[in-house]
Amino acid sequence: MGQKVNPNGFRFGITRNHNAIWYADKNKFSINLLEDVKIHRFFEKLTREYQIGNTVIRRDRNNAITVLVYTAKLGSFLGASGENLKKIVEKLRKTLKNRKIVINVDAVDIQSPELNAKLMAELIAEKLEQRKSYRIAQKFAIRTALKNGATGVKTIVCGRLNGVEMARCEGYAEGEMKLHTLRQNVEYATAIAKTTYGILGVKVWVSLGEIKEKNDIDAIIRADKRR
């Protein structure tokens, strides 16, 4: 049943870290969860502008929020002397509608954006919006990822492909993709392409190889925390 489950959620706590790290009492849990949703949606809108691959939210015991934003355009995200980052934090406070909240945003550089599933999905979606062939867009993304060290890549595009009346799905896969194996280091992401014929959905799976030893799992989790 590995292919029926979100590969990210399937591996949280085993070979991947959670995207939200905090604890709250029952009376505050729903409030914190709603704030997390707003934060993720806020940075989702900035994904293409700053090439944001992931967002991790952490809270301390005083409920101060630290948001780790993984971006491939670190310089653009920070701006000159951090001015752009200050503007982003201020907009985020307005989105949360709570100016008293203590919130910090830390930017982390993505070393290999070609291997990031989210950025790959957005790249395919962007090419589809530019009226590029969905076949060429997928094959280009797959070749780029494999050339940069991925052991396997799978992509699917669904919708009114080439403007046909009936929606359908077409995808490509190269290399290994063991979604049912928890040791397999797999990243999964989705994106939306808004075209003249309607919305096209994009799904991307990127495999970075199988983790053989427990020490390797611990190393990946520690590296994920440092990123």
UniProtKB/Swiss-Prot annotation:
It comes from the Bacteria. Keywords: Ribonucleoprotein, Ribosomal protein, RNA-binding, rRNA-binding. SMART domains: KH. The keyword DNA-binding does not apply. One of its GO terms (molecular function) is structural constituent of ribosome. GO terms for biological process: translation. Residues 39-109 form the KH type-2 domain. One of its GO terms (cellular component) is cytosolic small ribosomal subunit. The keyword Ribonucleoprotein applies. Pfam families: KH_2, Ribosomal_S3_C. InterPro entries: KH_dom, KH_dom-like_a/b, KH_dom_type_2, KH_sf_prok-type, Ribosomal_S3_C_sf, Ribosomal_uS3_bac-typ, Ribosomal_uS3_C, Ribosomal_uS3_CS. PROSITE patterns: KH_TYPE_2 (PS50823), RIBOSOMAL_S3 (PS00548). Belongs to the universal ribosomal protein uS3 family. PANTHER family: 30S/40S RIBOSOMAL PROTEIN S3, SMALL RIBOSOMAL SUBUNIT PROTEIN US3C. HAMAP family: Ribosomal_uS3_B. Binds the lower part of the 30S subunit head. Binds mRNA in the 70S ribosome, positioning it for translation. Part of the 30S ribosomal subunit. Forms a tight complex with proteins S10 and S14. This is Small ribosomal subunit protein uS3. It comes from Mesomycoplasma hyopneumoniae (strain 7448) (Mycoplasma hyopneumoniae).
